[in-house]
Structures are given as C-alpha cells and as structure tokens.
C-alpha cells in the first residue's frame, strides 16, 4: 500500500483507523494481550512512516444516524439523526431495560405515536441504518451477513453492564499509558476521535463529548503523543460545544482534523450540513489551525449524496460527487486563509 501511494507522488502519513478492541474498552481478561498486539501494529506503522493514528474509544456504537438519505431542497441528501426515531429504536426494537429513564416524557410520547403507524419495512430499515450500515463497515462487530443483528447488538451492549464513565475513563488511561512508550520510540501521534454524536446513547458511557472530557484524557496521560482528532462534525452535533473555541484551546494537542459541519435543530435532531454552513464554522476552524498548528493533517469528512451517487453503493457519508464538492470548498477556504495569513 505504501509503495502504491508513493507511486503517485503522495506520502502516507495518517492511518484512520487502528481500531481498539471492545475488550480493551471494557477491560476484559484478554485486554493486556490485545494491547500488546496493538503496540506491535503501532510499531509497524511507525516503521512504515505513518506518524498519525486515529482511533476511537466509543463502546459498541461508533457513530449513530437514523437516516442515510435525508432530502435537501436542492435534491441532494445527507445523513440525519432523528431523536424520536432513535428513542423508538431503543424502547421498541432494542427493548433495552430501563431505556425509558433516559428520555423525556415528550420524547416517549412521540415514540409511542410512532409505534402506532410504523411499518415492518420501516422498522427493518431503522435497524439496518443504526446497527448494520453505520457499524458494519467501521469496526466489523456486525455485518450484513448477521441473520439477527438486534440480538447480536444486545450481546455487545451486555459487555458493558456495570461499566460507567469513570470505569471507561480508567480503561482509556490504562490503554494510553501502555502504548505511549511505543509512540515515543517511533514518533507516532495517537489522536482519539470524539464520540459521534457527543452525547450519551443506549445507556453506554461516552467520554469524549465536550471540553471537560477532552481536558480529562489529555491530562490523564499528559504526553504530546496523546492527542485529539478534531472532528468538527462530531463536536458541532453537541449544542454544548463551541467548535472554534475548542479549536483555539486544543490546537496544540490536535494531530488530525476532520472538516465537517452540522445543523442542530431545537428538538435535538441534527443533519450534516454544507461544508460552508452549519454551526461548526469551518472557515474559522481552518484559520485557527493554519495559524496555531500549521501542517496538521486535515481532510474533508463526509459529503452529500448527489448527481448519481445514489446508485453507486457508496458507504454512508462517503459519496463521490458530494465529497468532491466539499473538497473543492475546503480547498478554496484553505487557499484564501493561507493568503490571508501570509499577507
């Protein structure tokens, strides 16, 4: 792969992702052996010249959406998180014990109304979106070959019974402390991806959601090789997060940037927005990183489905034309910002 990339005059310096096994996250008996394997992989990447490794510490659910093709007025579609649909999935499909305690009376009432009219096909589509399509190609826990993805998903959730935020934090500290010597030896920067969306889901602890969480893991293992993947899209989906302010605060500990934006609705729903719009304020974010951490790897993240992308079978969020449009937008932003800073 390295030779193939370099044959086009490019340099392979970032890997996204080197997945962290669930047993490392929940602290299973095989944790130490799995961490040793991880250290070997890190060393091999470092020897190959890869100096930036993105990963996440999200239990079970890497990222959550309820719709993969929510329509825009211009005919394109993008990813969407409908909170009531997610409540319905949790309470009526997953049937998670105690789920109702996590939601408001209004959300539960709306989910109950949805239960009266939803069709079997709509239920299957919701399962396919939340469990299979968004999870299967990310970490391999679930695939389209699973005959009963809901039961498999319940088994994965059960692994975290009794695991709260403090326990997951300590497991993250344990993991990072173990791999930092390898990072130091081979000059590899580890950068954790924020939880997507940055809120608690399905009773699982989520520990990279906001300013306080970021400060915690950076201070817990205070090593320059322990850093952040600054995903503007994930962070902007949390109304608690001022994305440019976080960029200013954590620019020096950011090793990788994802350029994506969202619009958050008053009811808590969010939709992936145009790269030049939404609450992430990507123009200002690019300006901050170009000024405070020049040379940090940045990439356009996700894109709308448009202009025939619909029939190509692309993974959710990774359409060709939509991503090329986002890339062109961000390329223009970077050119203007660099001229501005060099003036």
PLM-predicted stretches and their roles:
Residues 10-25:
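A short glycine/small-residue-enriched secondary-structure motif
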Residues 1-9:
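Aromatic-lined substrate-binding rim segments of carbohydrate-active enzymes
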Residues 67-167:
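Extended, charge-rich helix/loop segments that form flexible
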Residues 18, 58, 196, 302:
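Residue-level "edge-of-site" marker
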Residues 6, 23-27, 32-53, 61-66, ...:
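Histidine-acidic metal/acid-base catalytic patches
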């Amino acid at each position: 792969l390295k030779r193939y990339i370099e044959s086009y005059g490019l340099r392979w310096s970032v890997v996204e992702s080197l997945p962290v096994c669930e047993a490392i996250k929940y602290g299973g008996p095989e944790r130490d052996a799995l961490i040793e394997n991880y250290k070997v992989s890190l060393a091999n990447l470092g020897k190959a010249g890869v100096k930036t490794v993105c990963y996440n510490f999200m239990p079970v659910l890497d990222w959550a959406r309820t719709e993969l093709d929510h329509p825009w007025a211009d005919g394109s579609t993008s990813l969407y998180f409908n909170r009531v649909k997610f409540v319905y999935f949790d309470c009526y499909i997953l049937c998670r014990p105690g789920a109702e305690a996590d939601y408001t009376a209004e959300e539960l009432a709306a989910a109950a109304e949805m239960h009266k009219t939803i069709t079997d096909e709509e239920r299957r589509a919701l399962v396919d979106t939340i469990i299979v399509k968004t999870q299967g190609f990310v970490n391999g826990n679930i695939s389209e070959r699973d005959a009963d993805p809901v039961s498999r998903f319940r088994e994965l959730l059960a692994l975290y019974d009794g695991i709260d935020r403090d326990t997951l934090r300590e497991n993250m500290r344990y993991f990072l402390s173990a791999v930092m010597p390898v990072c130091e030896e081979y000059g590899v920067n580890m950068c954790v991806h924020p939880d997507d969306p940055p809120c608690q889901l399905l009773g699982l602890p989520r520990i990279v959601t906001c300013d306080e969480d970021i400060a915690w893991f950076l201070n817990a293992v205070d090593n320059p090789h322990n850093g952040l993947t600054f995903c503007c899209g994930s962070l902007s989906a949390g109304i608690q997060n001022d994305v440019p302010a976080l960029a200013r605060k954590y620019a020096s500990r950011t090793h990788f940037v994802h350029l994506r934006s969202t619009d958050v609705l008053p009811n808590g729903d969010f939709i992936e927005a145009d790269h030049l719009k939404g609450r992430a304020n990507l123009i200002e974010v690019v300006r901050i990183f170009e000024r405070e951490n020049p040379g940090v790897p940045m990439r356009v993240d996700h894109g709308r489905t448009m202009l025939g992308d619909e029939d190509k079978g692309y993974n959710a969020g990774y359409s060709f034309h939509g991503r090329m449009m986002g890339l062109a937008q961000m390329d223009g932003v970077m050119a203007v910002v660099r001229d501005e800073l060099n003036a």
